[in-house]
């Protein structure tokens, strides 16, 4: 399972967890997400990250991250989910505070390990979606170059 898929699964799990505990509206979910992100990214919101990375409004910021930055976010979200579940945290403010605490602690861990802070990591020149599309086109073109590879193995006909 690649990092993008892991993050997608963890996003859904965390979304469902906090939804059951009091984060219900899209605006509440946005505030919740930003509470952790702002601690992990030294005050930057998701919109700030998108602006810094120069990506469009409708684009997924996570599609514009290399694996180290994705791993930082996966770890934060997985640990937030675990803490919220383990401590049975409920209510919007308590959930936001818990997510912020985990984001802050992940950032402190990166610092202790002399790691690169997420906001200082490079941004790929192309999103994962663009790379996947290019790979799909390459495969399609490659198949056209070798049509015999598309034919099923059948024994030659005998007269």
Residue ranges and their predicted role:
Residues 1-159:
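Positively charged, phosphate-engaging catalytic surfaces used for nucleic-acid and nucleotide handling
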């Amino acid at each position: 399972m690649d990092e993008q898929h892991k993050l997608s699964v963890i996003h859904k799990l965390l979304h469902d967890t906090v939804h059951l505990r009091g984060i219900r509206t899209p605006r509440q979910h946005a505030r919740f997400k930003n509470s952790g992100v702002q601690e992990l990214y030294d005050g930057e919101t998701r919109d700030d990250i998108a602006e810094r990375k120069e990506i469009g409004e409708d684009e997924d910021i996570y599609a514009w991250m290399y694996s180290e930055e994705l791993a930082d976010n996966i770890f934060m979200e997985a640990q937030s989910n675990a803490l919220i579940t383990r401590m049975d945290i409920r209510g919007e403010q308590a959930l936001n505070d818990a997510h912020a605490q985990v984001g802050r602690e992940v950032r402190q861990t990166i610092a202790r390990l002399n790691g690169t802070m997420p906001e200082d990591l490079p941004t790929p020149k192309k999103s994962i979606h663009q790379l996947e599309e290019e790979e799909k086109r390459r495969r399609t073109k490659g198949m056209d170059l070798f049509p015999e590879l598309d034919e099923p193995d059948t024994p030659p006909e005998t007269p």
